[in-house]
Amino acid sequence: MGNVEVAWEDVISVINMVRTHLIIIAIAFIAMIAVMIIVRKKEKLIKRMIRFQSFFAFLLITVVTLNVAAAETLYNTLNVVLSDKGTLDQGHIDNSKKVIEDVTNEGVVMTKNDNSFLPIVPQKINVFGWSSTNPVYGGTGSGTVDATTAVGILKGLENAGFETNSELSDMYTEYRQDRPVISINDGQDWTLPEVPAADYSDKIINDAKDFSDVAMIVLSRTGGEGTDLPIDMGPIMDGSTMDIGTKYTKGTYTNNSKDYDDFEDGQSYLELSKTEQDLVDLVCSNFDDVIVVYNGANAMELGWTNDYEQIKSVLLCAGAGATGFNALGNIISGEVNPSGKTTDTWLKDINKAPYINNIGHFAYTNTDKVSDAAKKAWERADGIVSFVDYVEGIYVGYRFYETAADEGLINYDDTVMYPFGYGLSYTTFDETMGELRASDDGISVDVTVTNTGDTAGKDVVELYYDPPYYNGGIEKSSVNLLAFDKTDLLEPGESETVTLTFSDEDMASYDTYGAGHYVLEHGDYDISLRTDSHNVVDSKTYNVAEDIVYDENNKHNGDVEVADNKFDFVEGDITYLSRKDGFANYDTATAAPTNFELDGTIYGNGTYDPTDYDNDDDKMPTTGADNGLELFDLRGASYDDDRWEDLLDEMTVDEMVDLIAFGGHQNIAVRSIDKIRILDTDGPAGVNSSTLGIFGTGFCSEIILAQTWNTELAVAFSEAMGQEFADYHVTGWYAPSMNIHRSAFGGRDFEYYSEDSKLSAEMAKAEVEGIVNAGMYPFIKHFVLNEQEINRNAFLTTWSNEQAMREIYFKPFEDTIKAYPDGKIAVMSSYNLDRKS
């Protein structure tokens, strides 16, 4: 996990940039060799002189050519690599480590604690599971964390005063020291190293029993940029070739035993392997008090934790960065009371999710010339032109499960393991909901939270709404997160009143097939206080007397331009899931794709000849003008200031080309407008750039941050990160990532916040606030519909309806941009073909 990867495409790109220079050097080299061969029969003195002259000429040509390349073609690239990078301030490092631990203290989620087993006093503890010695600290790709100096799980326990069984940890490190690599460039090794149960000798088990009565099992799952987690491990186990329409990612797997396969056909990466299942059986048959720690960002199937009475407690702890695993020791010992809440719905059987047939590898067949364009865009795609259908529409995550349960489509308890917004504490809270109050600032409600237990703790206050649904009309979920907040640390008996404010516009739905605008339909809106998406504490009714349409005369939520239908072209010929008649079309809508014919418009967009659009009457824009302007002159100027046109007229075509072509990890200098060069860097996990040669503290994953439900912590999180960026003279940050957890198999789920758009939006706004406070600008990403990593570079066509796009996938971006109307943020696009969005 600590390896920093260099993209092979970048290497090829640099080689292509200097290809002409390399050809010149190669010709000079061949000429030198030819001369040396020709003069081989000359007199010795003459031969030496000619050979020396030819070698000197070759050397001179090489030096001059490389200097030209460095001064012109590679000028900006070398500037990035060779310029002064600055050094990290130790105070900033110390602050980062503290913030990471603070975030993880609140971001670990306790989902089970039978008989209040936890906390326990620091004592000896047996920690089982290979991942206890090599946990997941982050993800791969842009979210890579340098784990070489990070606090591991065992060290985190020891720092809290626990003593761990070294006989077990020694066995695991001897079994394997390195974690298999899920690489963006070099393939994926999905192996889950685990010592087979048969290899635990009687001595090891008996020694463990003598060491402690308490056992912990650590299991991990990892993911990363460029690929999604396997839905079916069977083809990976047997090395099958990826075929059109199959639902698995490429990769390899090495079994832990020669006696059995770890997975059977049809089992997913998010189920227990046989070796893991055997380990759970072994531990639970020898210990009565077992703690399970799941170290992963993707919502794994954990129904089995209820099948063992020995499993007393379950803790969810995704990639924890440099110091986050201290939080496990803090929580288990009771030094910290867990207050994290889930940001996704966790299922007992993921194969029953509505998206399951519509994620993964799906390729069009009638691609012809488009395949040639795809190969040029990304050679490793092998000409694949792919697609993914967002068939569930707005019914993503809890929006589906809560609504489907209300409509009688599913049995909730049989389907859902942990609701969205769920998490346990060592104490209990009483929440009292006040009356709704309407004012010019919106609608407010006070919630008084009282700690009714005997341990200090924090509580998350969650407010949801259930809009009136008219059968066959605008699609609506029966449960929607409306607002939330987190209390301060409340001592036993202490109370705090939290005020939650929202607007009636927040409850409007986008009416794609009727008004073509946002609409707040008439009727009663149930505003409910809940402990999670499923369990209601109290509710109030808010009535809307008549339909309100947010059109040109009444724009929605501060829109500059009216929100109207703009994305018919993204909808495609897809049957989308509808609540009509109790989800009557569920089977049809959620079935696997049957149409693999590429849309004619997209085919044309991939094969057109741009010269067909040349027009001899077109006039060349003004370039290279002397208008007496510098970029600094327009600092703070509005977007519509006429001087921008004059400034652009001063730039040359070459400068414009270079500004775009050399835009990776920097924003180059432009001499004509006296623009200085500034540095950008990638990654939500902090400074970790092989391109720039700078490395800093590894921050915990964004899902840990989101599970805090604490926006103040999110501000502190990115502000601390921004201080390290500033030490390295970095100004732009390729983050935060705010795509949606559409499925549990998303390779970059660790890098995104949640399945919910509201929670994602609030956390994103907070992170942007922190990074702006540090003097930087973020590149919020990946706009838009970037929920799948498989085939992301293979002309991926994403199909979705406009209501889902606006209410689910656009919302984090929309709310963040609206929060910064002065333009302090940039946007990174996705790779898919829905760029017009």
Where do the PLM segments sit?
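Short beta-strand elements
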Residues: 535-555
